[in-house]
């Protein structure tokens, strides 16, 4: 977590109070959630998206290179107690968490959390492949449908999830399918990293640094550059799950 994270959050909260922005969402791995949950509630965060790929301690420790699942769950439950809306994002990984799909659905239903299952994307080390990890979302849909039923619902967010409900109470499940069901034509996302680098697409390296504009008060130039780059967003990504990574950049660098 950046040392000045709360300063940024306070700034965004003021913008929200002035109605310059309508919502504040936070995406996190949850490791610092217990510490910051009260601040997130105080400064108007509308929803917390928590990346959580396993509910089994040993698996979580492995996939996060030493993370403590108990601490993350404590943070999530504290945020829930404070009234924050929580959405769990789970990347589907073959032979790793495909045996947890049902238990994750049940846990989210019990705690009234929204849930999205996401296909793994070929990003990261250029000479690595995600082929052995890939599971299409339809596999997860079939598993859930057989156990709990699955019906599409007319619910949309600003993101790419397609939502369904099950026979369980408090159960709303989204599926994000960048590989098997490309949604690039409806993508409305841009990303600015913590180091000030603008990216128009997760699947392309095209970028520019916004810091020189901000540091020299070239705000109008920056606005024009942002408009230009948004207009020039690529038509689609070129992810191929049976090939090597498309970009040499990890998701935690860009922001999910």
Residue ranges of predicted features:
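Auxiliary Fe-S-binding modules of radical SAM enzymes
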Residues: 106, 110, 120-256
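Radical SAM/AdoMet-radical enzyme domain recognition
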Residues: 1-118
């Amino acid at each position: 977590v950046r040392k000045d994270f709360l300063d940024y959050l306070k700034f965004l909260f003021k913008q929200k109070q002035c109605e310059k922005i309508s919502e504040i969402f936070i995406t996190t791995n949850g490791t610092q959630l217990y510490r910051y949950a009260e601040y997130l509630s105080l400064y108007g965060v509308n929803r917390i998206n928590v990346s959580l790929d396993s509910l089994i301690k040993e698996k979580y420790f492995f996939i996060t290179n030493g993370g403590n699942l108990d601490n993350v769950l404590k943070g999530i439950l504290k945020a829930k107690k404070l009234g924050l809306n929580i959405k769990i994002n789970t990347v589907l990984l073959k032979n790793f968490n495909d045996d947890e799909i049902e238990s994750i659905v049940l846990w989210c239903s019990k705690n009234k959390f929204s849930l999205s299952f996401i296909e793994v994307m070929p990003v990261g080390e250029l000479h690595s492949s995600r082929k052995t990890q890939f599971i299409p979302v339809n596999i997860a849909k079939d598993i859930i449908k057989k156990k709990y039923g699955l019906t599409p619902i007319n619910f949309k967010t600003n993101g790419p999830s397609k939502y369904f409900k099950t026979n369980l109470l408090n159960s709303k499940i989204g599926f994000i399918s960048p590989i098997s069901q490309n949604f690039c034509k409806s993508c409305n996302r841009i990303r600015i990293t913590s180091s000030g680098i603008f990216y128009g697409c997760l699947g392309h390296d095209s970028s520019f640094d916004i810091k020189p504009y901000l540091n020299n008060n070239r705000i109008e130039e920056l606005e024009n550059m942002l408009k230009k780059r948004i207009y020039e967003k690529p038509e689609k990504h070129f992810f191929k799950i049976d090939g090597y990574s498309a970009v040499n950049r990890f998701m935690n660098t860009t922001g999910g």
